[in-house]
Amino acid sequence: MGISIGLLELKSIPVGIEAADEMVKAANVQLLTASPTCPGKYIIIVSGNVGAVKSSMNVGLRVAGHYMVGHHIINNVHESLPSAILGVTEVEKIASIGVIETISGLSAVNAGDIAAKAAKVEMLEIRIARGLGGKGFLVFTGEVSSVRSAVKAVANTMG
């Protein structure tokens, strides 16, 4: 069984901190990130098995209430995403580089999963909203044809 990632964006930093705390106490999940982002929002990303992430997200949504801006669960996420989100990816060789910018931080994670599953590319980094005006971007490497295929898959799926 693969891992899942749960993403929650709030428009209150104190409520975001409370939600993150309750989410990790509610289920056996790893907290990948929980931090303020631009413009004045808070993003929480957890990973774990499908059931744990679902339980954790349900608690997060309850705590967030009307402060919730967006949420998403990606089941069976590509194995490279957690390290790319944490910014700790190690690769042996960087070939061609692909960069995709998204309108929101949460959609950058979804785009990364699509790209990594669509072509033989290695995720280098997924940056989520910090210092980006709420946007996100991902950087990956691979052969030219693979990078182009990954970019095309994201464009076709997400628009």
What is each stretch, according to the model?
Residues 12-13, 36-39, 49-51, 76-78, ...:
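Short, ordered loop/turn segments at secondary-structure junctions
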Residues 1-11, 90-103:
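Short glycine-/aliphatic-rich beta-strand segments at the starts of folded cytosolic domains
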Residues 1-40, 44-47, 51, 109:
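The feature marks the first
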Residues 1-2, 24, 34-38, 65, ...:
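Solvent-exposed alpha-helices and their adjacent loops that cap or buttress functional pockets
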Residues 31-34, 38-77:
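Acidic (E/D-rich), amphipathic helical modules within compact regulatory domains
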